[in-house]
Amino acid sequence: MKPFLIGLLAGLCLLSAGCGKEATPPPPAAFYSLHDSTGKEIVLTKKPEKIVLLSPAFLNIMHAAGGDFVAYGSSPSLDAPDYAKGKVNLGYSYQINMEKLIGEKPDLVIGLKGLHNPLASSLEANHIPLMLLSISTKDEVAQAIEIMGDVSGHTEEGAKASKEFQKEIDALSRKVPDKGMTCAVIFGAAHAVMLAKEGTIATETAKILHFQNVFAKEGASEMHMMPFSMEDLMKKDPDILFLTTMVTPGQEKKVFEEVLLNQPAWQELRAVKEGRVYFLPQNLFLSSPGIDYPKAIRCMAGQVYPEMRF
């Protein structure tokens, strides 16, 4: 009988996961996790209460998803929306005031991939998570709407806004005839003129409207821009030319005059002869319009097809 009791006690010890030791409780589940546009895993242990948006393009995305923010990066070419009033302005998106940003003690900062990567080390040193997102394409914007709905605790609202956003863009794309027309997007800055390849707002909008960018696959695959060449432009001779700039409003034509408009070869281009040269406004094409992507599509479509209503 005694050996039996000893065996019984031993079995009970095993079933209770060890005599004299308490079971370790499992770690609490994270509130949210994802891999951002850089491939980095972001894990939020709880719902963020103080979200900072480093790009003005994120403001209308977060608003559409039903979320809120405490501070934001601004733009010299865009007025802050009414729902940004009372929030902390951290300066221009490309020149964020880090002292102000860290002073806000945010529990999540959302920035643009590429532009805000250099801020990662400073934020990490202050134990502030940084999520970097790309929002150049319609699919990236649609995903960003859902992400901002998730992190702000408005998952259903974000999913609904994302679905409506995609539905509107698809309807606009179907409305425009696919005539197999080709295009080139020329980007002008104060000291340089470039040809856009893929991954810019203008090239992605053109793709939605069935315009084939003749320089999409040229040059290094990882670059969005390539050096301008009149010779290359003459060889491709696209049906449409879109011009977009990063200069002071009102100076758009001036930046192109010497390199393009005053060149004899410019007048020989088919798009110039047929009157298919269009300037794209900075407020829609310089940086991502975010939730206003359909406005960029309507703008471009309306220039090429003025007889149609968008």
Language model: regions and residue ranges:
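Bacterial Sec signal peptide processing site at the extreme N-terminus
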Residues: 20-31
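Alpha-helical, coiled-coil/dimerization segments enriched in small aliphatic residues
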Residues: 76-79, 195-224
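Proline-aspartate-enriched helix->loop->beta-strand connector
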Residues: 98-114, 128, 229-243
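Short helix-initiation/N-cap motifs at beta->coil->alpha
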Residues: 35-39, 88-99, 220-230
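C-terminal motif of bacterial Sec signal peptides marking the signal peptidase cleavage site
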Residues: 15-18
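A short, structured surface patch at a secondary-structure boundary
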Residues: 53-104, 108-113, 211-214
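Extracytoplasmic substrate-binding proteins
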Residues: 31, 40-43, 118-194, 215-216, ...
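Sec-dependent signal peptide recognition
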Residues: 2-8
